[in-house]
Design a protein with these regions (language model features):
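N-terminal beta-alpha supersecondary unit
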Residues: 1-66, 190
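Patatin-like phospholipase
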Residues: 6, 11-29, 168, 207, ...
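Surface "functional belts" at beta-alpha junctions
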Residues: 22, 34, 89-190, 217, ...
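Residues at secondary-structure transition points
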Residues: 30-38, 69-73, 77, 94, ...
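Phosphate-handling active-site elements
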Residues: 50-56, 83-93, 108, 207-208
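DPxDG-like acidic metal-binding loop motif
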Residues: 61-90
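Glycine-rich phosphate-binding/hydrolytic loop that grips phosphoryl groups
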Residues: 186-217
Length: 235
C-alpha cells in the first residue's frame, strides 16, 4: 500500500511518500509558515519523485499537533480533502512522537519541545524505539515545570532536547541541567516527514475516516484565550 504523509505543524513543512512502509521520497522546506502557499506544490513534487499517482495512494497521514494552530489546520485540512476525494482513510500522527522518532539511536531520555509562546513549551518525553516509548504525556507548560517532570522520569539518563523550542530555550536548559543536557544539532532538531510516514504506517490498522481526522490542541488558540479574558473582565 502507498502512503502520503504531510506535516505543517511547525516552521518546516514536509511531505513523504511511502511504498509498503519504505520511504520512496522525503522533502522538507523551511518556509516561515507559508504552508498554505507551498504545500500543494510540495505534494505534487513528492508524488512525482516517488513515481506515484494520487490515485495510487491508499492511506493519508497528517501531523495533528501540537504545534502552530494555523499550521496544523493547513496540513490536516489538505489531507482530509484528499482522503475525502479519493475515498481513502487517514491516520493522525503526534508531532512530539514524530520528533522523538528522529532521535532513535540514543540512550538518553528524548525530550522534544516546541515553542508554544506565552512562556510555555509543548513537550513530552520518550525512550528510543520505533515507535518511541512514551515516558511523559504531551503537555503545555512553562519550561521549569516541564524540566521538573522530565527529570522525574529520566533516572540516571541524560536528556536529549530537540524541536524548535531548543532555539528559544537552549540557554535556560543548559543552565538548569548542565552536562546532563544533550542539545541535538540543528539538522536533527526538526520533524522529518519520513518519521511521520513511518509512524502512520505502523498505525495503519487504526486509520479513520476523513471526518474523524482532527487537530489536537493542548490549549485554546490565542484568539479564544483573549476573548475569554475579555469576557471574564466584564463579569
Amino acid at each position: 500500500m502507498n502512503l502520503l504523509a504531510v506535516d505543517t505543524s511547525g516552521p518546516v513543512a514536509g511531505v513523504a511518500g511511502l511504498k509498503d512502509g519504505e520511504v520512496a521520497y522525503e522533502g522538507a522546506a523551511v518556509n516561515r509558515l507559508t504552508h498554505s502557499v507551498n504545500l500543494m506544490p510540495m505534494i505534487e513534487e513528492a508524488l512525482g519523485r516517488a513515481g506515484l499517482d494520487v490515485s495510487e495512494i491508499g492511506l493519508y497521514a497528517a501531523v495533528t499537533g501540537p504545534g502552530s494552530f494555523t499550521g496544523v489546520r493547513i496540513g490536516v485540512s489538505a489531507v482530509k480533502g484528499m482522503a475525502h476525494g479519493a475515498g481513502k482513510p487517514c491516520v493522525g500522527v503526534d508531532a512530539l512522537e514524530a520528533l522523538a522518532a528522529g532521535a532513535c539511536l540514543t540512550d538518553a531520555l528524548i525530550c522534544p519541545i516546541q515553542d508554544a509562546r506565552a512562556g510555555q513549551v509543548y513537550g513530552a518525553a520518550f525512550l528510543a524505539g520505533m515507535p518511541p516509548v512514551r515516558m511523559l504525556p504531551n503537555m503545555a507548560e512553562a519550561l521549569p515545570v516541564y524540566l521538573d517532570r522530565a527529570l522525574a522520569v529520566a533516572g540516571e539518563r541524560r536528556l536529549c532536547f530537540l524541536g524548535d523550542g531548543v532555539s528559544t530555550y537552549r540557554d535556560a536548559i543548559v543552565e538548569r541541567l548542565g552536562e546532563r543536557a544533550v542539545i541535538a544539532p540543528a539538522h536533527m532538531r526538526y520533524l522529518r516527514p519520513a518519521s511521520v510516514g513511518e509512524l502512520a504506517w505502523l498505525n495503519r490498522e487504526r486509520s479513520v475516516d476523513y471526518l474523524a481526522l482532527m487537530p489536537v490542541y493542548l490549549r485554546a488558540p490565542q484568539a479564544e484565550r483573549e476573548r475569554a479574558r475579555r469576557l471574564g473582565g466584564r463579569a
